[in-house]
UniProtKB/Swiss-Prot annotation:
Periplasmic side stretches: 35-56, 101-116
Keywords: Cell inner membrane, Cell membrane, Membrane, Transmembrane, Transmembrane helix
Membrane listed as a keyword: yes
Cell location: Cell inner membrane
Topology in membrane: Multi-pass membrane protein
Name of the protein: Inner membrane protein YphA
GO cellular component, one term: plasma membrane
Record topological domains on the Cytoplasmic side: 1-13, 78-79, 138-140
Cross-referenced InterPro entries: DoxX, DoxX-like_oxidoreductase
Listed Pfam families: DoxX
Transmembrane segment boundaries: 14-34, 57-77, 80-100, 117-137
Family per similarity comment: Belongs to the DoxX family.
Length: 140
């Protein structure tokens, strides 16, 4: 039982950390590219959410979801970027998925997405603590 309890993944650890980095940011890259390509629509969407300073919010969203996410995959500035992603992910949860202010059919999906964002922030906290692993530009 102790073997399973203290299993450290041995030689597979660097590969598994790479897979984890990709998995954590994949959602940002997938949804960030359309935000970047349709930037005017992103600004309008931010305004519709009631985001403060919609233009700035759209710029932050695009920068975090595309280049910053790609840097996480590459394992470059991983720990500081992971900390930024914690704040970004929690901020988007509060701004974009404020289910407590909603009614009807909007409550359920937004509650799910709010708590998914909280879980993703937890994954970024783990990444900030563990670092990117050996298969990274940071190599730590």
């Amino acid at each position: 039982m102790n073997t399973l309890r203290y299993f450290d993944f041995g030689a597979a650890r660097p590969v598994l950390l790479l897979i984890a980095r990709i998995a954590v940011v994949l959602i940002f890259i997938i949804f960030g590219f359309p935000k970047m390509m349709g930037f005017d629509g992103t600004v309008q969407y931010m305004a519709s959410l009631g985001a403060p300073m919609p233009m700035l919010a759209a710029i932050i969203a695009v920068v975090m979801e595309v280049p910053a996410a790609i840097l996480i995959v590459l394992g470059f500035f991983t720990r500081p970027l992971a900390v930024l992603f914690i704040f970004y992910t929690l901020g988007t949860a509060v701004i974009g998925h404020h289910y407590w202010d909603m009614t009807g059919d909007a409550v359920g999906p937004n509650m799910i997405n709010f708590w998914k964002n909280v879980s993703i922030a937890g994954a970024f906290l783990l990444l900030a603590i563990t670092g990117p692993g050996a298969i990274s530009l940071d190599r730590r």
